[in-house]
Amino acid sequence: MTHYHFVGIKGSGMSSLAQIMHDLGHEVQGSDIENYVFTEVALRNKGIKILPFDANNIKEDMVVIQGNAFASSHEEIVRAHQLKLDVVSYNDFLGQIIDQYTSVAVTGAHGKTSTTGLLSHVMNGDKKTSFLIGDGTGMGLPESDYFAFEACEYRRHFLSYKPDYAIMTNIDFDHPDYFKDINDVFDAFQEMAHNVKKGIIAWGDDEHLRKIEADVPIYYYGFKDSDDIYAQNIQITDKGTAFDVYVDGEFYDHFLSPQYGDHTVLNALAVIAISYLEKLDVTNIKEALETFGGVKRRFNETTIANQVIVDDYAHHPREISATIETARKKYPHKEVVAVFQPHTFSRTQAFLNEFAESLSKADRVFLCEIFGSIRENTGALTIQDLIDKIEGASLINEDSINVLEQFDNAVILFMGAGDIQKLQNAYLDKLGMKNAF
């Protein structure tokens, strides 16, 4: 049994990885900031110790896993090197783990977490599958056949992995603090494609993914009969979204997803494609799909009287549009109110007009102050720059949260990758509910 210490254990990937190693029988602990982060709930539920940062946390005979947000000058990393311990980056360590399984990486600018969560749930309906999801959830199942994991393109971290399969949901310009432009993003995905050992499953409507070259087959999914696997006869019901799936032009089977929105059907198609290629039992796959409950911070709902309170991680214009679309399709007779907290100054600056356009699809818009990051906590613009671009938009904070009570028959979308859950909880407290998120 190895003793692992995770520096930055509350990070979404680090939290998941720590849980996996714990499940596989290792001794696990970690350190992080003392502020509450939603990922710590799962860690505490498994009895994994979370410590404040301190060089004295590092002991002899530990293996230290270094989170991507922390430099080698961090006090705990310095102490680990002084003790001549093995210090392994998150990406390199995960890359070592996946080689023990038939692995499926899920990557793309948007939809990674939802698709990874769906993939792990559905595959476990037929074969034991360990998984690492970007919502801070991870599980290591002994004697697993498969390993499903989220692979992030930021700073080209995903190039540490050599998976058997890769699902590529889309290529889009994001992380403007690192990538120069869309061509730079494409180059990263192109390099990743050459790491894949068996096959790539890619969204057929993405113009950039259509240009990807690989040493393995590329299977495209979508809504067109020119795709290798596609959905037709899509019907929205009170149970979710029903659709027929065709493979190479031939009817494969009828499926029901309990979710709503075109993007959820696309996610399901990618997962069904993997299941088809690995010859998993389609009856088991269908049953598992119908019981998928979603992942953390992806359209998580709480209903109070005539209001539906939604917690969602959307922090890019396309993700915001998809979340609003889901609300419209699932609740066509309700008003849609967007409460959004921009994440990082560089992203807000780069997509200012796009944020305004996507948020304007809601009936009302409320904006929070911009949330910075460890690497970037100031910028040239303010939230007022975005407010000025959206008709009727206004600033909201914990002191003014009661303004949301006026929307009697509405879906209230709390969106963002920062600490917007503080605002959600403040509102829920006013409504008489506590600790929902």
From Swiss-Prot:
InterPro entries reported in the protein's UniProt record: Mur-like_cat_sf, Mur_ligase_C, Mur_ligase_C_dom_sf, Mur_ligase_cen, Mur_ligase_N, MurCDEF_pg_biosynth, UDP-N-AcMur_Ala_ligase_MurC
E.C. no: 6.3.2.8
Residue ranges of the TM segments: none
Signal peptide bounds: none
Record: residues binding ATP: G108, A109, H110, G111, K112, T113, S114
Compartment(s) where it occurs, according to its Swiss-Prot or TrEMBL record: Cytoplasm
Gene3D superfamilies per UniProt: Mur ligase, C-terminal domain (3.90.190.20), Mur-like, catalytic domain (3.40.1190.10), NAD(P)-binding Rossmann-like Domain (3.40.50.720)
Name under which the protein is recorded: UDP-N-acetylmuramate--L-alanine ligase
Annotated source species: Staphylococcus aureus (strain NCTC 8325 / PS 47)
Origin organism lineage: Bacteria, Bacillati, Bacillota, Bacilli, Bacillales
Gene that this sequence comes from: murC
